[in-house]
Structures are given as C-alpha cells and as structure tokens.
C-alpha cells in the first residue's frame, strides 16, 4: 500500500467543493479550535463532502455541526478498502465527537504457553509475538483463568514464573495437590512434559476427542507392559478430561472459532455483545457500550450515512431476502421505513465495532451477526488482513442460532443494567470495571481492597486495608496492621509485609480446601473452595506509584496470585485530586483518566478512605507509644506498677493530672514514690 496523498485546504466551501476529486478517500472536519468533529470515508470524495453543504433539509444537529466546520482535510486513497482502513485508524487516534467510538481494548487477554524448555502456562495481555504460543483472544480474564484451571487439572502444566522455577529445590503445593508435575525438580521427563504441552494445545484448539483417543491408547500400552502405576495415572488424566468435556457438553459445537455479535439499541444507548467460541467451547461474552452514538446516529438519520453496499451475509441455508419499501402500501411502507431506520442505527454501530475491534487484530473465520453490516468493503478488508475468508452469518441455524439468541438477550440485560446504574454509585463501579477490563454479570460481587502506609518520620508505622464490596465501603471488614521489624520510614518494606500477612493465609486456606476436596475425590470447585476463593479480592489498589506496585507484584508472584489485579494510584502534580495516574503490575501502560472520570472518582473515594483509616490508626498508635514511653521512663515504676497506674487513671493524661495523694492510693505506690512520680511528670 502506497502512502495516500493528503491535503489541507483553507475553509471556503465553494472553492473546496470545486477542488475535490471524484476519487475514494477520507475526509476530516475541524472546528475553529482545531478539534476534529468528524472523520468519514467516501468512494467519491467530491459527491460525499458536497452533500453536507448542498443538501437543504439537514437535521438541527447536523446543521449545527456544519456551521462549526472551520477546516476540511482530505486524504485520497487508491481504493475504498484503503480508505476504510485509514478511516478506522483516524477515528481511534482522534476520537471525533460525531463518530461512533468504542473504547480501544488493546489488552485483550490470551492464554500463553512460553517457549521455555518446560513451557509455562500463563494469563497474558498485550501484543503477541512469534516466539511463544498464544490461544485466544478470550472475552474476559475469567475465561482465561478457567481454562488455566482446566489445563492444570488435566495436564498439570506449570504456572510459576521462570525466576521461581529456576530456584526451586522441592516441589510446590500445586504438585502436592495434583495440579503440577513438578518439572522444576525433575519429577517428569522432558519428553513426557512435551507430550502434556502438545495435548493441552490441541485441547485449546478444539481437538479434545483426538487427545482422548491418544490417552486411551497410551493407557492400554502401559497396561500391556505391566506398568500399572503409569496406566493408572493416564486413566486419572482421562477421567479428569472426561469430566471437563461432560461439564462443557452444552457449550461444545461443531465450530472451532466463531465470534457472535449482537447489537441492541434502547434509551439512547447502544450495546454490542461479543460472545466468543474458541476450540468449539463457548467462552462467555463481553458487553461494549460505544460513545458519541447520539451525534453519529443523527448523521445517519439525517440522510448522511455512508454510501455503502450492504455486506453479504451467508450461512448453510439461504438468508431471507432484503426487505424493500417501494412496492408496499403506504402504511406498510412507513412502518418499513421506521424499521429500516432502526436497522441502520444498529448496522452503523456494528460497522464501527467490526472496524475498530478487528482491523489490526486476529479475526475468526466466522462472524455471526444480529444485523447485516452496512459495508461490503469491510468484509473484504478483514479477509485480506486475516489471510483467509471471513464469512458473515446473518440468519444462523442450529447451535449458532442459540448462541446468537443468547448474545442478544445478554446485550439487552447489559443495556438495561447500564441504564439503571447511570448517575449512581453503581455507575462508578461500572466505569471502574470497564476501565480495568473487569468482567462480571453482577458488579455487586466486585471486591476491591486498598492499602495505605502511614507513619510520622518512621514512627508508629501502620498499614491500613479498606474494603469496597456491594457498591459501598464495608467498614466492618477494615483492618489495620502494625508494621514491625523494618527500617523506620521504609514504605516498600512496610507494603511487602502487609501484603504478605494479608494474603498468605488466604492462599493457604484455598490450597487446603483444594487438597481436602482432592483427597475426597471431589471434581470441580466445591462450596469449600468457593468460600476460600471468595475471600480474595478482584482488584487491589495500592496507594503509590511504580515502586510500590513492583513490591506488590513481587509478593503476588511469590504467593502465586494474579498480578493483573494490582493497580497503583500514583499522585499527580502537586498531589491535586483528579490528576492521579493508574499504574499496573502486568505491563499495561499507565492510565490517566481525568477529573471528570467516574472511575477515578471511585478510585479516589476508596484511596481517601484507606488514607483516613491509616492516619487515624497511626495517630492513635503514636499517642499510645508516647504515653507508654513516658511512664516507662519513670524511676521506681516497673511493669506491674505501670499497669496499675494506667488501670486507675485511664492513661498518661490521667496519671499526669493526679495529685500526690491520688497516686499514693494506688496499690504498690508509697507516699514517697508518689512524690517522686509527681516530680518526674511535672
């Protein structure tokens, strides 16, 4: 693809229209401040741009946009496909007010098998490379972790980081509960581990029956050689795999990789629900809510939608023909026009989603859609980019139809939930969940814990942990931790200590629950395991920047916890509220949300509560320490007499205010000692 020809023309509408070519390309409208208003593509730039200035019946909002245009830039391209690609890139980069815009989720989760001698299985976000194996993308972090748990149970691949793997001298707890074959200590050969890795990869690719057949052959071979222990191990592996396949029976279809896209519009908002099928397994879905929809759809309703040919939808059975309006009676024609208008809204949104979500990313061979996208060029460009034909299925049958129906229902539910949450604390929770790519059907279950360290010049160091759950702060679950055994003022050591103390026991409880279930022959997650796992938070906020987050990452790695839940809250310039930056432990780029962000409002609320709780605890501890230290300095007053004085007068202040006679009335305090105490305190 050659570089397109670009031009910037001073804004004089008549001159601009006269100079525009009858060629495909992209146009951009700017206001007087230089802010981009709209980005569009056209197969004929002259006709398309002229329509904004020559059409007499424009809607008020379109007319308002046209009056704000102060500059037009155009870029000529060789083809409509090239224009489509450039348009998508510009929309992502410029976020124009009048374009439909989806949040750019560059950190879609994958399951990664590393290129190590003993490959590690890991949750991964970010760009993929050719060195490691990647499976996905997955619709949510939960789907990745569920797959990892399945592979641990069936194939027992390692999940520890290489730094931990290289320094192990004995098997970890995962080996003891049958979740890892302990290659770190040579408990399995290179060849056998490689077979497990190959089987796991084929399982993820949807070739489960092939894996099961090979395991059965392997079991019989061991039995024929009288290697009954090895045969029993393979039998157990087959049993675990059979259990998994049985649990997923309703999810598995003949398709290997399919994406299902359902679009629903209601109450001025639009939801696109994306469901993913990978390796024949339905992995769940994710709801997307585009911004700038109202402005963009006003353009479409005003007759200025893009000049496109509908994309052709295909399936094993023929689709219903496209409805027309011309040959219908007047009343039916009016109704059909209304339906067509509504359909165009969803088609425009679907076009925007497909372009912004798939261009530049992996595309499955089949997209099942609730509405036919407006642009055929888009489908052709996706196929060219993917290196294989990408088919759109508009009216699916069988299992695909059930998947689409479920996606549409989930889109309606997600949209209804969003509308009910707007303007409330639930809206803040939703905003934070979307910002951090946390997926859950019930945000009330979202548990956030936040940590803060407080001290005065290294004195009375104390850490606080506050909890946000069910859309509110849970004060009964707040905890304070006295930090000891560190260099005064060492916040990093304090953070390491509190995180270790907080989560080490939780990890042990979860492991013990799994071990008990394993011994009892219970497959899957029991109530015992669920209760142990529910104690762990979904998001952990750290009041601090990169240094504190790195310490937290080290602790979580040592404990085997997911580092993607760690979020640092770094203070902005001058420590002003609204200028904070979110720092991540899993390699994601730092994020600045801005003062008006509902997500940042919730983060600040939780962070400030942690700070308040830490400060009050630190002050109380410091005051108590200072009181105790003054009494400890009194000559002739040991531990027992000190306790009696505190019990009688309630603290240092009461002892200081007491007279000699009152001091002498305390058991074990003579009149002479009372006078001595009085003189030392005054």
Curated annotation (Swiss-Prot):
InterPro entries: GIY-YIG_endonuc, GIY-YIG_endonuc_sf, GIY-YIG_UvrC_Cho, Hlx-hairpin-Hlx_DNA-bd_motif, RuvA_2-like, UVR_dom, UVR_dom_sf, UvrABC_protein_C. GO terms for cellular component: cytoplasm; excinuclease repair complex. It comes from the Bacteria. Residues 209-244 form the UVR domain. Residues 22-100 form the GIY-YIG domain. Pfam families: GIY-YIG, HHH_5, UVR, UvrC_RNaseH, UvrC_RNaseH_dom. GO terms for molecular function: DNA binding; excinuclease ABC activity. GO terms for biological process: nucleotide-excision repair; SOS response. It is found in: Cytoplasm. Keywords: Cytoplasm, DNA damage, DNA excision, DNA repair, Excision nuclease, SOS response. Interacts with UvrB in an incision complex. The UvrABC repair system catalyzes the recognition and processing of DNA lesions. UvrC both incises the 5' and 3' sides of the lesion. The N-terminal half is responsible for the 3' incision and the C-terminal half is responsible for the 5' incision. Belongs to the UvrC family. This is UvrABC system protein C. It comes from Burkholderia orbicola (strain MC0-3). The gene is uvrC.
């Amino acid at each position: 693809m050659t570089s397109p020809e670009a031009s910037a023309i001073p804004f004089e509408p008549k001159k601009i229209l006269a100079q525009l070519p009858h060629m495909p390309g992209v146009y951009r409208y700017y206001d007087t401040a230089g802010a981009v208003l709209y980005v569009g593509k056209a197969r004929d730039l002259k006709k398309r741009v002229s329509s904004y200035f020559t059409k007499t019946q424009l809607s008020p909002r379109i007319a308002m946009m046209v009056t704000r245009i102060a500059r037009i830039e155009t870029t000529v391209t060789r083809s409509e496909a090239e224009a489509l690609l450039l348009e998508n890139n510009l929309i992502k980069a410029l976020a124009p007010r009048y374009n439909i815009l989806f949040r750019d989720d560059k950190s879609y989760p994958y399951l990664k098998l590393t290129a190590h001698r003993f490959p590690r299985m890991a949750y991964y976000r970010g760009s993929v490379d050719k060195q490691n194996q990647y499976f996905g993308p997955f619709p949510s972090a939960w789907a990745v972790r569920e797959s990892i748990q399945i592979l641990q149970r069936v194939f027992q691949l390692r999940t520890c980081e290489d730094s931990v793997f290289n320094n192990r001298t004995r098997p970890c707890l995962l080996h003891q509960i049958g979740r890892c074959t302990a290659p770190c200590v040579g408990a399995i050969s290179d060849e056998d581990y490689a077979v497990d890795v190959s089987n796991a990869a084929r399982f993820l690719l949807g070739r489960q029956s092939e894996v099961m057949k090979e395991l059965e052959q392997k079991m019989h071979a061991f039995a024929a050689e009288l290697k009954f222990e090895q045969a029993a191990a393979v039998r157990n592996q087959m049993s675990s795999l059979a259990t998994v396949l049985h649990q997923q029976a309703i999810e598995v279809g003949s398709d290997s990789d399919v994406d299902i896209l359902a679009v629903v519009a209601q109450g001025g908002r639009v939801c696109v629900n994306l469901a993913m099928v990978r390796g024949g397994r339905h992995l769940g879905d994710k709801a997307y809510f585009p911004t700038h929809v109202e402005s963009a759809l006003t353009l479409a309703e005003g007759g200025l939608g893009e000049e496109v040919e509908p994309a052709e939808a295909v399936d094993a059975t023929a689709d219903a023909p496209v409805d027309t309006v011309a040959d219908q009676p007047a009343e039916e024609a009016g109704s059909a026009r209304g339906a067509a208008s509504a359909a165009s809204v969803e088609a425009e949104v679907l076009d925007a989603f497909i372009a912004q979500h798939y261009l530049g990313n992996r595309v499955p061979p089949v997209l099942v859609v609730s509405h036919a996208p407006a642009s055929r060029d888009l489908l052709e460009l996706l196929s060219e980019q993917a290196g294989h034909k990408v088919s759109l299925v508009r009216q699916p049958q069988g299992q695909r139809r059930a998947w689409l129906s479920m996606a549409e229902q989930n889109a309606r539910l997600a949209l209804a939930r969003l509308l009910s949450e707007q303007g409330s604390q639930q809206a803040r929770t939703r905003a934070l969940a979307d910002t951090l790519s946390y997926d859950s059907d019930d945000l009330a279950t979202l548990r956030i814990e936040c940590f803060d360290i407080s001290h005065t010049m290294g004195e009375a160091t104390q850490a606080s942990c506050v909890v946000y759950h069910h859309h509110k702060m849970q004060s009964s679950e707040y905890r304070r931790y006295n930090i000891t055994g560190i260099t005064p003022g060492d916040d990093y050591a304090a953070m390491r200590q509190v995180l270790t103390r907080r989560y080490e026991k939780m990890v042990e409880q979860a492991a013990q629950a799994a071990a008990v279930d394993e011994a009892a022959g219970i497959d899957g997650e029991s109530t015992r395991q669920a209760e142990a796992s529910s104690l762990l938070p979904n998001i952990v906020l750290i009041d601090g920047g990169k240094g504190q987050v790195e310490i937290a990452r080290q602790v979580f790695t040592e404990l085997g916890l997911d580092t993607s839940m760690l979020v640092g809250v770094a203070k902005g310039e001058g420590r002003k509220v609204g200028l904070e930056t979110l720092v991540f432990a899993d390699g994601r780029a730092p994020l600045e949300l801005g003062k008006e962000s509902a997500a940042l409002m919730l983060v600040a609320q939780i962070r400030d509560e942690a700070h308040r709780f830490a400060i009050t605890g630190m002050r109380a501890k410091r005051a108590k320490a200072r009181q105790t230290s003054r009494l400890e300095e009194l000559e002739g007053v040991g531990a027992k007499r000190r306790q009696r004085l505190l019990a009688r007068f309630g603290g240092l202040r009461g002892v200081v205010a007491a007279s000699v006679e009152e001091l002498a009335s305390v058991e074990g305090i003579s009149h002479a000692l009372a006078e001595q105490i009085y003189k030392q305190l005054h």
